[in-house]
Amino acid sequence: MIKTKVAAVLIGFSTAMSGSMAVAQDKELIVATDTAFVPFEFKQGNTYTGFDIDLWSAIAKELKLKYKLQPMDFNGIIPGLQTKNIDAALAGITIRDDRKKVIDFSDPYYESGLAILVADNNNSIKNAKDLSGKTVAVKTGTATVDYLKSQVPDAKLKLFPNIDNAYLELATGRVDAAVHDTPNVQYYANTAGKGRVKVVGTVKSGDYYGIAFPKGSPMVAEVNKALATLKANGEYEKIYAKWFGKQP
C-alpha cells in the first residue's frame, strides 16, 4: 500500500513537471530584452539581433519553445518578472544575491565586469579611485550603480535609462567618465566612439550574466539543460565567436 502511494506521488510529480514544460511549449512566451545593449541585444533595421538574441534562439530551438521578444527599459525587467508579466529576460543581467531573492536565474552564460570610459584626451582618470569627485554617467538599475555607490561614494553619479545616452553625455563633454559592462564599453569605444573616447581600465571582474525568470519558474531547469547541451555540442562557441571574435 505504501509503495503504491509513493509510486503515485512520483508519477504525479513527473506528470506535473512535464506538464509545466508542455504548457511552456504550447504558449507563446514573452521574453524581455533591453535592445540598447550592443553587442548583446540591439535593433538592426527591423530585426532584433545580438549575442543574447542568438543564444535564446538556440535555446528555444532546443526546447521547441515559441516566444515573442519584448523590448523594455532595463529597470522595468525585474518588476516585470516579479509580476509575471514576462516569462524570461535576457539583457546582460548580472547574477546577484539581492536579485536572487525576488527572481530566479539560469546557470551563468557569460562572464562580464565593469570598465571605465573617458574622453580620448583625458589623462587624469586611470582607475576607479580617480573617479572620486568626478561626474560619472551610469545606467539606471544596474550593478554599476551599486558598485560605485559602495566603492567610490564621492563620485557624482548621473543616471540614464539608456546606456547610449550616457555615452553621448561623455562624448559631448558633460560628464567626466562613463562606467558600464566591459564588452559594451569596448564595443562602443571601437565603433561609434572611436577617436573620441577610450577605455582606461576595468573596475571589477568576476560578474556573470544569467537568464532571468519569475521566482519558481519550472523553465529554469530545462533552460540549464539546454545551455549545457549548446556548450557540449559547440553551438555556444559558434555564437560566442560570432559576436566577440574569439572563443569563450
Predicted regions and their residues:
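Alpha-to-beta junction loops
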Residues: I30, K64-K66, Q82-A91, K134-T135, ...
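A ligand-binding cleft/hinge motif common to bilobed small-molecule-binding domains
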Residues: G92-K101, Y147-S150, A171, D176-S205
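Sec/Tat signal peptide C-region and signal peptidase I cleavage site
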Residues: S18-D26
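Short helix-initiation/N-cap motifs at beta->coil->alpha
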Residues: K68-P79, N123, T140-A143, K158-L168, ...
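Flexible hinge/capping segments at coil-to-helix
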Residues: A119-V136
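Periplasmic-binding protein-like
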Residues: Y110-V118, T182, Q186-A228, K246-P248
